[in-house]
């Protein structure tokens, strides 16, 4: 079974969490793209979705699901999104698709966060995947210096502008033993908009696709 087939299988499993939901949150990425495509069969009961990126918004519109403003939608019942890494505590690194800030906002606005991943994303310790940090452009060099002081090796993701008009620094060589503390420390750096550690608001449910089937992280 290919990695793409695993992603589709775990996306199918997530449908069970949205069958009775009228307005849901939808994330960004290749696994979520499968989930959005599968929503086409359920869209009769879905009144709208709050999306974390322009790319997901366009995909939702193509299957006829209205995209809503979070300010109007209020609290969401369920948010479905993928992750670049996830640990046993359901804490994640996200932001490989540069949508981390909006993903974190929609996750915070949701009662239940369902994370869908294939088994390659499961890790014991976060940090092998470079940690994305969204930064206001004028602060890029300042933030990079502060990230070096934290032990990381930041690399500017050139030719990438977020939906919010900011830039991304991908921080390599971090071993994240205390995700909550690191999330707070990076957020405290002036110029940082958001970082891709999702520990203060971890997932509530993690669905993992593998060749033997889909399992739920206990």
From Swiss-Prot:
UniProt keyword list: Isomerase
Catalytic activity: aldehydo-D-ribose 5-phosphate = D-ribulose 5-phosphate
Domain of life: Bacteria
Matches recorded under SUPFAM superfamilies: D-ribose-5-phosphate isomerase (RpiA), lid domain (SSF75445), NagB/RpiA/CoA transferase-like (SSF100950)
Assembly with partners or alone: Homodimer.
Similarity annotation: Belongs to the ribose 5-phosphate isomerase family.
Name the record gives this protein: Ribose-5-phosphate isomerase A
Taxonomic path: Bacteria, Pseudomonadati, Pseudomonadota, Gammaproteobacteria, Methylococcales
């Amino acid at each position: 079974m290919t990695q793409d087939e695993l992603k589709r299988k775990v996306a199918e499993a997530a449908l069970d969490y949205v069958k009775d939901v009228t307005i849901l949150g939808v994330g960004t990425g290749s696994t979520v793209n499968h989930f959005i495509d599968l929503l086409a069969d359920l869209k009769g009961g879905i009144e709208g979705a709050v999306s974390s990126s322009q790319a997901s918004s366009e995909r939702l519109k193509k299957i006829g699901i209205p995209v809503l403003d979070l300010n109007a939608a209020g609290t969401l019942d369920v948010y479905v999104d993928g992750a670049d890494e996830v640990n046993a505590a359901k804490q994640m690194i996200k932001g490989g698709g540069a949508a981390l800030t909006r993903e974190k906002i929609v996750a915070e606005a949701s009662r239940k966060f369902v994370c869908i991943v294939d088994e390659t994303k499961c890790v014991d310790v976060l940090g092998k995947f470079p940690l994305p940090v969204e930064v206001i452009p004028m602060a890029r060099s300042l933030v990079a210096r502060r990230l070096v002081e934290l032990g990381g090796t930041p690399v500017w993701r050139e030719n990438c502008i977020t939906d919010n008009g900011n830039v991304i620094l991908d921080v390599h060589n971090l071993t994240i033993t205390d995700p909550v503390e690191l999330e707070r420390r990076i957020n405290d750096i002036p110029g940082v908009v958001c970082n891709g550690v999702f520990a203060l608001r971890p997932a509530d449910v993690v669905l993992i696709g593998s060749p033997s089937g889909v399992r739920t992280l206990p």
